Structures are given as structure tokens and as C-alpha cells.
Regions:
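N-terminal Sec-pathway targeting helices
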Residues: 1-18, 26
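Mature, Sec-exported extracytoplasmic domains of Gram-positive
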Residues: 29-211
Length: 211
């Protein structure tokens, strides 16, 4: 290879590197707004993992750090729930019934789920709480866990839809829409804030925002 040819080759490589760098930078800028935040794909692995933690919502809870709210979210993030026979349950709850085998969640499992969702330093007092409009988790001190009672309720369930995901430094913000069960119209729009601590993201906040 002659000196002239070598020089042209080197120049070509440099130009290609500059072009590739410019394309990459431009691509990154497309997903980054002027305030430094960047949009994430709704199919992003972290986004889908975090959304799964709050996608079961069937109650209009706003203060996610409130004790009963933490238990509610923890309950829906426990995949392997046990059952218990209502005949051995000592507690009762007005308006709710317990018959045959029903869902039972140990106190320790709820506490563990709270830490997985909110952070290792978060503590919770296990008590009775609403699971959804038709079910109530009643704490049974004898069996050290909650027993899920049920009741009749004809109201439509709340449908939740993920609208957007944004990364803001050490935070990931998920914006969701609450849809009318019949017409599918947007009733409310909420934003969930997950803050990174170590390798994991933990739920810290929920607020009403504009659509």
C-alpha cells in the first residue's frame, strides 16, 4: 500500500468514526429532553419490571408510603400465596365472609415484600387492609398472617395503563392512566417515582399529574 493510499485510508477511517459518533450522539439526543431526562421504551426490561409492581392497582391510593398502602402493594407483589381453611380462623370482619379455603399470606412474607418494593430499611406494621373492592385482608394474630375475606360488590374494576417511562438521574418515573372500565376514557393520570438505591429501584412516591 502506497503512502498516498494509506493516507486516504486513514482519513476515511477517521471520517467514518466521526460520522458514527455524530449519529450515536444524535440518537441519544432524540431521547433526551432539555432538562436532562430521557424517555425509556415501555418494553425496557427495567420499566416492565417496575410497572409490574404497581400494575395490579384496583384502589385509588395516593400516599404509597402509608402503612396500609405498603401492605396493599406488597400483597400484590407476592406470587406464591398460601391458603387456609376458614374453620380455623378466629377473626371476623363486618360485611365480609370467609368460607372454605381462602388466600392466606404470612406476616413475614408481607414484611419481606415491603422491603423488596420500598427498600431494605423500610419497616411496616402488619394489620388488616383492603385488597380490592371485593376483598379484605384480615390480620389473624393466632396464625401470624392475613386471611382474605370477600364481599359482594358490583362496581367496575379500575383499569390501569402505562403511558410513559422517563429516566431522571437516579430516578425512573412511570406515568399511568386510570381508564373508565366501560368507555375506556381517561379518569386520572398518576406518576410513580422509583429511586435507585444500590442496584435496585424502590417505590417512593405517587402523585396526580396532567395527562
Amino acid at each position: 500500500m502506497g503512502k498516498g493510499t494509506l493516507k486516504k485510508f486513514v482519513i476515511t477511517v477517521i471520517i467514518l468514526e466521526i460520522l458514527i459518533g455524530a449519529i450515536y450522539y444524535g440518537y441519544k439526543k432524540l431521547g433526551t429532553s432539555s432538562d436532562g431526562t430521557s424517555n425509556l421504551s415501555l418494553k425496557d426490561k427495567i420499566v416492565t419490571t417496575l410497572y409490574k409492581k404497581i400494575a395490579h392497582e384496583d384502589l385509588e391510593i395516593l400516599d404509597v408510603m402509608e402503612n396500609k398502602a405498603m401492605l396493599y402493594y406488597a400483597y400484590w407483589n407476592i406470587d406464591d400465596k398460601e391458603t387456609i381453611n376458614c374453620e380455623v380462623v378466629d377473626v371476623k370482619e363486618d360485611g365480609y365472609t370467609c368460607d372454605g379455603l381462602v388466600t392466606f399470606v404470612k406476616k413475614n412474607d408481607l414484611e419481606k415484600a415491603v422491603k423488596n418494593l420500598y427498600g431494605k430499611d423500610i419497616t411496616v406494621q402488619v394489620e388488616s387492609f383492603e385488597v380490592d373492592k371485593k376483598h379484605y385482608a384480615v390480620y389473624d394474630e393466632t396464625h401470624k398472617g392475613v386471611v382474605v375475606f370477600s364481599k359482594e360488590d358490583n362496581s367496575s374494576p379500575i383499569n390501569i395503563k402505562l403511558k410513559s417511562a422517563v429516566k431522571d438521574e437516579d430516578k425512573i418515573l412511570l406515568k399511568t392512566q386510570i381508564l373508565d372500565g366501560i368507555y375506556g376514557t381517561v379518569k386520572e393520570t398518576y406518576q410513580y417515582t422509583f429511586v435507585k438505591n444500590g442496584k435496585d429501584y424502590y417505590l417512593t412516591k405517587k402523585e396526580k399529574v396532567k395527562a
